[in-house]
């Protein structure tokens, strides 16, 4: 947890140089349970929560414009599983995109979205902003590679939004909808991706 002014200033901006919003506190959880408890508490007390990753974006999406809690995903940085047979990766949001790309390449797989900041941006930010890059012309953008999301909702409930299959006709495309609308906009925190 950070409450000192120097730390708060570090988290008060992204790569948009002219935007600066100071949070009241910065929390850096290590588990989904910590996020769930934080979200439930903040929801009960009407405290705004802004999820943030590496803050390399240019849209202001990770800025705490209402103050409150900035919830950093930097400690949620594990690649949980690489399923070579089904060509699927399960990862936490704080994994650096280039690290993910290099790790799957070692297994003979390919993760195409390649934003210019891939050496420092987190996969969570890529999903939240639906990042692309030069390879998007041929291979598509991030939403084209998201099958399922684990999301901590504002009340602390933990849900999964989809299924770990490419063909899934059991209802709405919630992972795609979540990427397009971004759970950040409705107050959820994405904690795992497939």
Regions from the language model: what does each represent?
Residues 3-4, 52, 100, 114:
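Residue-level detector of family-conserved "landmark" positions at structurally sensitive sites
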Residues 78-82, 89-194:
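FAD-binding subdomain of flavoenzyme oxidoreductases
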Residues 31, 53, 125:
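Conserved phosphate-binding and hydrolysis motifs of nucleotide-dependent enzymes
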Residues 53-56, 96:
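Ser/Thr-glycine-rich phosphate-binding loops at phosphate-binding pockets of nucleotides
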Residues 1-40, 44, 57-87, 116, ...:
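N-terminal flexible segment immediately upstream of the FAD-binding catalytic core
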Residues 49-54, 110:
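A short, small-residue-rich loop immediately preceding and capping a beta-strand
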């Amino acid at each position: 947890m950070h409450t000192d002014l120097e730390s708060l200033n570090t988290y008060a901006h992204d790569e948009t140089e002219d935007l600066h919003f100071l949070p009241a506190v910065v929390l850096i959880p290590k588990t989904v349970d910590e996020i769930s408890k934080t979200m439930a508490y903040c929801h009960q007390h009407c405290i705004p929560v802004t999820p943030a990753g590496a803050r390399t974006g240019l849209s202001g999406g990770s800025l705490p414009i209402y103050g409150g809690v900035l919830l950093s995903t930097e400690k949620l940085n594990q690649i949980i599983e690489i399923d070579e047979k089904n060509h699927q990766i399960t990862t936490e949001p704080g994994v650096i995109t280039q690290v993910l790309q290099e790790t799957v390449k070692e297994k003979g797989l390919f993760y195409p979205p390649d934003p210019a900041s891939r050496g420092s941006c987190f996969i969570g930010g890529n999903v939240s902003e639906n990042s692309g890059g030069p390879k998007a012309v041929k291979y598509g953008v991030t939403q084209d590679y998201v099958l399922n999301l684990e999301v901590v909702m504002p009340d602390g409930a933990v849900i999964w939004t989809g299924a770990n299959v490419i063909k899934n006709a059991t209802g709405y495309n919630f992972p795609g909808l979540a990427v397009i609308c971004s759970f950040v906009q409705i107050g959820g925190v994405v904690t795992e991706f497939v």
